Amino acid sequence: HPPKDFKKWAQICEHIIRHYNEGWANGFHYNIEYWQIWNEHDASTPSGCWTGTPEQFYDFYETAYRHLKGLFPELKIGGPALIGRQSTAKEFIAAMAQRQVPLDFLSWHMYFHTVDAFRNNVNFFRKTLDEYGYQDTPSIIDEWNIKPFDLTQSHYMTVLTAATMCAGQHEPVDMMLYYDIRIGSTFNNVFTRRAEPMPAYWAFYSWGQMTQLGTSVQ
């Protein structure tokens, strides 16, 4: 649900940052650079992460961003972990541009079963950011995986994972974060509950071997 007081929520986040980066309240000095505001406000489901209106979310995001960026100009404050739907993504980017709210980074999610679908969304997000004046805003996929999930046990999972990472080297996306490898998670297709390798594991293993070579070929 939307916080009752957007400013107070931002102040709570301020102290979380101070706790983990500045040692406040018996904290730490982790120097975490990236801080994401919210998650999947555009999921549009009763059990989703945001039950308010899109306009309420835009107000909320602007309030949080301006408060945190004013205090921590050296950090990257961004988000909002969009679900990857092109229509709602464009609405969010357009709203931030209209309000003149900077986007230190734009994060979004994608679950798919073809590399073409991956390429299509990656290029859409980059094109839309550029169109609204955010040419310098990094595009970050902070959740990606296969869908439908019944493919996770197949050899196709290995191929798709490897092909997606290869495509990501040459498409306009700045970071890709695989979601996820928690043992027992619905989204985990890297290890079984006994920590045995699943199909996607071999794509990551092979990728790790290739990265030691230092260059990629086209």
Regions found by a protein language model. Name each.
Residues E40, D142-E143:
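Active-site beta-strand/loop signature of hydrolases that rely on acidic residues for catalysis
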Residues A163-Q218:
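Aromatic- and carboxylate-lined catalytic core of secreted/periplasmic carbohydrate-active enzymes
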Residues T137-D142, L177:
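Active-site neighborhood of phospho(di)ester-bond hydrolases with catalytic His/Asp-centered motifs
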Residues P73-L75, Y134-T137:
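A short helix->loop->beta-strand "cap" motif at the edges of active sites that frequently abuts
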Residues A81-G84, E143, Y179-R182:
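Short, solvent-exposed turn/loop segments enriched in Gly/Ser/Thr/Pro and often Arg
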Residues H1-F105, H109-T128, F149-A163, V190:
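Active-site cleft segment of glycoside hydrolase catalytic domains centered on the general acid/base Glu
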Residues F118, T137, C166-G168:
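Long, acidic, intrinsically disordered low-complexity segments
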Residues A43, I146, I183:
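Active-site micro-motifs of SAM-dependent methyltransferase domains
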